[in-house]
Each structure stands twice: as C-alpha cells, then as structure tokens.
Regions:
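Conserved, mostly hydrophobic/aromatic
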Residues: 27, 31, 56, 87, ...
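Hydrophobic faces of well-ordered beta-strands that scaffold small-molecule active sites
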Residues: 6-10, 35-37, 64-68, 95-99, ...
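Short, acidic/polar
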Residues: 15-27, 79-83, 167-177, 248-262
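Flexible, glycine-rich active-site loops centered on histidine and acidic residues
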Residues: 2-15, 73-143, 188-197
Length: 301
C-alpha cells in the first residue's frame, strides 16, 4: 500500500465564504493532502462547487481539490471536461474529478435536469467517462453519437496531469462500471459498514474482467466524527443504517483507520468533521494521522 492519503470534506455554504478561504489554508498548513467539496446545485444556501474550487486553488499551493461528487445530470460531460481541465491547468495539476450519477431527481428536474432510472444513470456515467477522456486528448476532432452526451467537437485543452475519475458508487451496476473504467471509489456514507467488503469485491471482479489490476483503483473511506479525549468508539462507523459518528481518542481513531486500510484496502481517508474548527484539524493532523500512517506502514513491512 502506498502512503495513506488524508483529506477534509467541506460544505460550500455561501454564508461562510470568508471562513472557507481561511479554513483551506489551515487544512494545507496542517499537512492534509486534499479537500473535497459536496456538489448539490439545487441547495439554495450552497455556492457553486466548481466556482468555489476555482477560488480556493488560488489560496493554496499544494492541496488537491475534488468535487465530492459532481452532479452529472446537472453538469453535462462535454462542459465538465472543459471545466475540469481548466481547473487542473489553473492549479498546476491539483484537481481530481469525483462524479455521481444523481439521486435527488425531483430537485434535479426542478433545475431543468433529466430524470433517469438506475440503469439509465449507469449508462450516462459510462458515456460521460468516454467523453471526458476524449475531450482531454487535444488536437483532434471527435464525433461520438451518444444517447446522453453526443459529441462533435475539437478536443482540448489537455489537463496538467491525468485527472483521476472517481465515482461515488453504491449499486452493483455502478460498482461494476467503476471497476471497468474509473480510477477510484469514493465510498458513499449510504454504503453500510458491512456492505463495504462486498462492494470492494464487485469492483475487483469488474477490474479483472476488464484486464485491469484492482490495486490500481483508489479507495476512499469517509469518516464522520470528532477527536476527543474519551476512549469510546463504535463498531459501526457512520455508514448506512445504524451507523454512528466516531467520537474518540487519537489512538482509537488510528485503529479504526488501520482496520479499513489493512482489512478493506482503503488508501485514502476523507475526514468529515462534526466541528470544522482549527483545533479539530490540528488534533487530527498531529495526533491521528501519524499513528495511522505508522500502523499501516508496519502492516506492510
């Protein structure tokens, strides 16, 4: 396993603009690797996620940024490719693309987006991945007669680096698509604690069927909680029905992370702080991350 990566999840609330700028600088100074930002364009109090990322990359020099996850039905793949490549160039190669098929169909339709069945949603994501890769190879004229994202255009610009496409997949068809075509899995909070191993196996089987090495696919575990001085935790970190936030000491936090990394091959941790404070960032960065990285290094030795 490569060195564990750690990120922080942000809410793009319009009322918090000043704090968001300061907060990402604190995240970077604390040593985190990336920031992920939820993308729900139909939430009135939220800023546009991509516009916010474009602003925050200018406040940082090292952090990577990723929508968690881009609402594909409201962001056509053709323009998503252009926006993503632009952000990657503007940031010097610090942008990755998380994609979601869409769930809140009433709200999506309310903004003029389509309603899609589960099967249609998977097909649309598959088609979008092909369009994204085509648009990121510059200097060509591409014609694709897709059902969801038809393309007849000159391609480009090329991003600064090979942008990873990470999916927030839940169902078996989407997990299979991920293993076949995508670069990473952002395990949704709705994926139950006990369901994660089976989901991993589905991804692995699809990857092998496509001639890919399952180990090449990144896996992100999302953990909600607070670092405390009380040695209490739950055997069911917050995911799916019955899950709970993790509220415990740094050593138990590190133990939970190590179990996900060693037992289920998650290589990236997305922290969703219950309290988005400087002190919580400091505690996680200085007391949890070193323990977790040391433990996973020992497991691989």
């Amino acid at each position: 396993m490569d060195r564990l990566q750690f990120g922080v999840f942000l809410d793009p609330r319009a009322a918090d603009i000043g704090r968001l700028r300061d907060y990402v600088q604190e995240v970077e100074a604390a040593g985190f690797d990336y920031v992920s930002i939820q993308d729900h364009p139909y939430v009135p109090d939220f800023l546009d996620t991509f516009a916010l990322i474009g602003t925050l990359i200018g406040q940082t020099s090292r952090l990577r940024f990723m929508p968690n996850v881009a609402n594909l039905p409201l962001r056509p793949a053709q323009m998503l490719a252009k926006t993503s490549a632009s952000l990657d160039l503007l940031s010097g190669g610090r942008f990755e693309l998380g994609i979601g098929a869409g769930r809140a169909w009433d709200q999506i339709a309310g903004l003029g987006g389509p309603r899609r069945s589960p099967r249609e949603a998977v097909a649309a994501v598959s088609e979008a991945i092909d369009v994204l890769h085509a648009m990121w190879l510059p200097g060509r004229t591409v014609s694709v007669g897709g059902r969801y994202y038809p393309l007849a255009a000159q391609t480009g610009p090329a991003p600064a680096h090979r942008i990873g496409i990470w999916l927030g997949s839940i169902g078996p068809r989407m997990l299979g698509l991920l293993g076949h075509k995508a670069d990473g899995w952002i395990a949704p909070l709705a994926t139950g604690y006990e369901a994660k191993p089976a989901a991993q196996e589905r991804i692995d089987a699809a990857a092998r069927a496509a001639g890919r090495d399952p180990a090449s696919i990144h896996r992100v575990i999302q953990l909600v909680g607070t670092v405390t001085d009380i040695p209490y935790t739950t055997s069911r970190p917050r995911s799916g029905p019955g899950g709970q936030p993790i509220r415990t000491t740094p050593d138990i936090w590190a133990k939970i992370i190590t179990e996900f990394a060693a037992g289920q091959r998650f290589d990236t941790v997305n922290l969703i702080p219950e309290q988005a404070t400087s002190e919580q960032l400091r505690l996680f960065a200085t007391e949890v991350i070193p323990l977790a990285r040391a433990a996973t290094s020992d497991d691989q030795a």
